[in-house]
Structures are given as C-alpha cells and as structure tokens.
C-alpha cells in the first residue's frame, strides 16, 4: 500500500482477517437446509470435531483463525448443549437483518495444517457459513444469498421429518407442524436454480460444484435401522478418506430417502449434480 506501513489482509465483504496462508484455493463451504433441520447445531458439533477427533485422525493441526466471534459462539452453544442446556435459537433470516448486519456476517474459519511427507507443511483454509432455513423457502429469498454463488461446495442439511413419508411419525413425536411445510425438494430446487444461474450452466449440463447431503436427527429412526447398519457403525479411524465407507453410507441414505417418499429429491440430485454424496 501507499502508506508503506504494516497491513492486515481482510475479506472485502465480511472483513474477517485472512491468515497468511489464505489463497484463492482456500475453499468456502456453504451450509444450507430447511428450517429447523439443525444447521447451527451441526456447525457447533463440527467445530468441536475438527479441533479434536478429526485432527487426531489425520495427524493434523486444525484451529480457528481470523475473527473468532462465530467460532466462540459455536463453542459456547456446544458447551451449553453438553450440559443439558438450551439448543441454539433459530438463525435470523436474511431479510430480517439490516444491511450492515448482512455485510458483517462472519463465517467460521479454520486452518488445517498437515505434513505432506516431504518435510514440508501444507495449509488449507476452510470457511463455513450458516444460513437461515427460511431464506431458502422461496426462489426470491434464495437469490439474495449471494455468497452461495461464491462457494466451492455446499452442504445441504435435511430434516427427515420434512419428507411426506415421515409426517405421521413427526406428529406422533410432537414435531412443530410449521416445520413440516417446507419441503426438502423445494429447497434443493431453489439451490439448483441459483447455482445454475451463478455458474451459467445450461439445462443440458450438470452442476460441477460438489454437494454433500446430510440427514439430521437420524437417531430418531434407530428403532427401524439395524445396529450393524453403516449409519450406526462408528466411522473409520484411518488417517485418510475412506471412499468405500463413504459410498456404503451414501447408498444406505439413498434407500432411506426413497422409503421416506424422497425419490423425487434423489432424481433431482442425479440429474443436476455431477458430484454429490
């Protein structure tokens, strides 16, 4: 800069300080889902797992970086839940916050450091955003989520009670009727439309951006899932991504979604994304 003084690199949008290892290759992950699916809870648990079991498994050093306000909130929520306290409140919708609040919204940023086996260190920055489920209930609101167009990958969190095949079970368990109105298929359709427009992908091609589909609250269905199912077995503790294990879980989740009247969502995934699990 012209002042020739010390400077700090920050994101031009949310003003989160960038670590020295941040580059254009550092992935930004968007976390989206229907209202009440548990996105903030998942992010709270993910933040803890990254800095404990995951870094041990991969012999890595993983730590929060930049502005840690959201990371601190996630840690407080996780601690409160562990003590049997309250769950985090619903994330405020995009349209219900001021422009200043939108512009200052911060991701949870983690730096993953790993030895590459040649006496050198590799570092990757992961950023996670939390989005209110109501923001994805209509295409008009979804278009306002400009950051989704900049993500390198998207995590879609689904509430199993949102599938029509589980509505009766949801009511028997006292699930709020209002949470059954937003269909998972509608949220996925809006995401597909946004990403197609952002990437200028025509109807004859598939979206190349990876999509991870996560089903929350799966423990509510353990009575109907065998104990030896891949969905209930502990995951691998080997220091690498287990492709066979991932594919096995993928196939079992797909079968569950089909049983829950989610066949339309599965076909939408297959027809619109080249990479998804």
Residue ranges and their predicted role:
Residues 29-33, 126-130, 210-217, 275-276:
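Extended hydrophobic secondary-structure segments that form protein cores and membrane-embedded regions
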């Amino acid at each position: 800069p012209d002042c020739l003084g010390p400077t700090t690199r920050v994101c031009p949008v949310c003003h989160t300080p960038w670590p020295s290892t941040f580059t254009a290759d550092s992935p930004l992950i968007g976390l989206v889902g229907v209202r009440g699916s548990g996105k903030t809870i998942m992010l709270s648990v993910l933040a803890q797992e990254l800095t404990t079991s995951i870094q041990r498994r991969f012999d890595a050093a993983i730590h929060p970086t930049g502005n840690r306000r959201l990371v601190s909130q996630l840690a407080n929520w996780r601690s409160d839940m562990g003590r049997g306290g309250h769950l985090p409140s619903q994330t405020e919708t995009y349209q219900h916050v001021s422009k200043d609040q939108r512009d200052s919204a911060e991701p949870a940023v983690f730096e993953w450091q790993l030895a590459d086996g040649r006496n050198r260190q590799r570092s990757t920055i992961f950023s996670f955003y939390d989005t209110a489920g109501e923001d994805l209930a209509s295409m008009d609101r979804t278009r306002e989520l400009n950051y989704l167009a900049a993500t390198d990958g998207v995590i879609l969190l689904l509430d199993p009670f949102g599938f029509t095949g589980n509505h009766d079970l949801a009511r028997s368990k006292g699930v709020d009727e209002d949470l059954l109105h937003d269909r998972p298929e509608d949220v996925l359709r809006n995401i597909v439309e946004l990403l197609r427009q952002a990437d200028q992908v025509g109807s004859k091609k598939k979206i190349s951006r990876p999509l991870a589909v996560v089903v929350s609250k799966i423990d509510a269905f353990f009575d109907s899932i065998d104990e030896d199912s891949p969905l209930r077995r502990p995951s691998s503790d080997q220091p690498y991504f287990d492709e066979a294990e991932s594919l096995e879980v993928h196939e079992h989740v797909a079968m569950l979604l089909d049983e829950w009247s989610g066949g339309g969502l599965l076909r939408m995934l297959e027809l619109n994304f080249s990479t998804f699990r």
